[in-house]
Amino acid sequence: MYAQRLLDNLDPREHEVHVVLSNYAQQVVAEELPGGLRLAPGVKTHNIKSMNAPFASGSNPPDAMVVIPCTMGTLGRIAHGYSEDVLLRAADVALKEKKKLILVPRETPLSLVHIKNFELLALAGAILLPANPSFYAGPKTIVDVVDTVVARVLDHLGVPNALAPRWSEEKD
């Protein structure tokens, strides 16, 4: 649901939007999104095994990249520079080219290994944005809760949004 709400709020007419789904992400989509992932016209998709995506090269790095949600396995592989598929390669490129890389893990609790991987990624310049929703605005639906996290991702991407009330804003 996090990925869907992010995609719902990235207009491919204003932003170049690419989607890569890992095998596990495809399972998550099947379980969490009845009807599958909805993509707006203009969103480009890439096979996880295809290394021909334009953003898989330092000569054409992405402006920004979001892995949402991000498993601890993926986070660990990114932290240690493994690039066996296009998702991991693109993350590696984003880090080495000093582009914005936002990772949105939702797993809990964290082990020391996870925390050390967080540390490595933070030192490398990644933005670690755990999927910890806020409740101060009194969300009424699951989508409202998810949107508190997605709004923060959009903020870090520099994409204006009104998905969730800001601290001290009036509630509707």
Report the location of each language-model feature.
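A cross-family phosphate/adenosyl-ligand binding-site feature
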Residues: 1-102, 106-172
